[in-house]
Amino acid sequence: MNRYDLIIIGAGPAGLSAAISAAKNGLSVIVFDENSKPGGQLFKQIHKFFGSKEHKAKIRGFRIGEELLKEAEELNVTVVLDAIVTGLYQDKEITVKIGEEICHYKGDAVIAATGATENMVPFEGWTLPGVIGAGASQTMMNLHRIKPGNRVLMLGTGNVGLVVSFQLLQAGCQVAALVDAAPKIGGYGVHAAKVARCGVPFFLSHTIIKAEGGDRVRGVVIGEVDSSFQLIPGTEKHFDVDTICLAVGLSPMSQLLHMAGCKMQDTPLGYVPVIDENGATSIPGIYAAGDVSGIEEASSAMIEGRIAGAKAAEYLGFLSEDAAEETTAELELALDRLRKGMFAPENRGKKITLTDEGIPVSESLLTKGYLAEDELDRFPGIAKGKGIHPVMECTQNIPCNPCQDACPRKCIKIGETITSLPVIDEENTCSGCGMCVASCSGQAIFLLNEEYEPGYASITLPYEFLPLPVKGDTGTALDRSGKEVCQAEIIEVKTLKAFDHTSLLTMKVPLDMAVKARFYKSGGCSHE
């Protein structure tokens, strides 16, 4: 039987982070993963992460995965792929199917970082080819470079549904609509806004009635639901689509912990093990980290993994109690920073009407996916100024502050609490470098110059689509809802290594469109 100080099940963000944390303290570590590639969800996450520097903010998920893998390899962590753990027992022994062979491994401690699986929603036609999970579509696009379909309807407006919808657009798919039975958008408003300004409509208080097609998806019918989520007759709407993506939540894959005899509980986060603040289960030496203990963001999973790795090192005597306490206290503080604001775990299901600063939230953002013009003036980041200046359409208390760190002239302030709304420091002058625009994980910052030339303004916006426009191109400016508003001319295209594949387009629009225009589309304006 093969023996290791620590066995980790799952090579995703939590598992790799736990392995690194433990190996740094001298433990022999082996990690098993059922997939052919390590990294879990990270390698299909091409978007930039939120948080602060300590949470790897403004770094794309797949790059974080590469960093974790490299660090694990340098620490001589053994990673076994295509390895299905079929059993976990109280004595910390596991059985693993590798190829056609069943292998036995014994650890002095075990960390389960098995993640979660996508939920499905049954409806008429839900087993037709073309009905897929949002995560599956991410795998197809970002790992295998395959378009899931040509015209897609997305069910679910949490962060997964919003992020994947944007990535579908980047892949060249048409997104017919985002649909959700809830009356409000569930994910970050900045994610919704970048989808809305591409012209994608939201249908809230709606659900899928049926998928149409004999051999595959050829259409979908949705309908409105009442406050009890019952279908309202006569509200049916039809869309011609060939793909239906489901982003309706995740369920923790906690079966192995249950099998081991860990105490379990049903919670709003799923069927999860009972753990303490350090991830320790009811069985000494067995820990849980990441989505297996409750669904959160990958940033949280990485910190939970590091905590579990440190506590396993303490449990086995590789780390003193004082050193472990110091390490975990710092990590718990970082985790706590991520769990603040409107989307904090304790706020799930609550109706939030005011920001932490006491500002009324944008109802338009929650119900339509974009800010209404009559709501703009209430938010501190959307300030008028002379010459070129940033306009920050970040209006919810979400954990993120890269813009503050990116600005070389300190024009942007967020403060110690990373969920605070960004504000403009009027004592400092914007240079127009665009670092804040490129660093914003939510693509919610623009540079505005209403004095560009008589009768015209310039707007610099983030752009992550191909083909990339070139200077001199003329096209159409779209407003926050994706509506065509005027003709636009590209006057500058900036692409730097520091921007990490977020190009900056600067377009010239009529002065009266400076407050409206927020996106660029190649081709003429149908209203001209």
Model-derived features: positions:
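Residues forming the flavin
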Residues: 1-376, 457, 523-525
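Short, surface-exposed secondary-structure boundary micro-motifs
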Residues: 313, 480-482
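Iron-sulfur cluster-binding cysteine motifs and their immediate structural context
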Residues: 401-419, 435-451
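Short, structured beta-strand/loop micro-motifs enriched in basic residues and often containing a Trp
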Residues: 452-462
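Short, well-ordered loop/turn sites that connect or cap secondary structure elements
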Residues: 468-470
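Short beta-strand-centered aromatic/proline hotspots
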Residues: 483-497
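Short, solvent-exposed secondary-structure boundary/capping segments
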Residues: 495-509
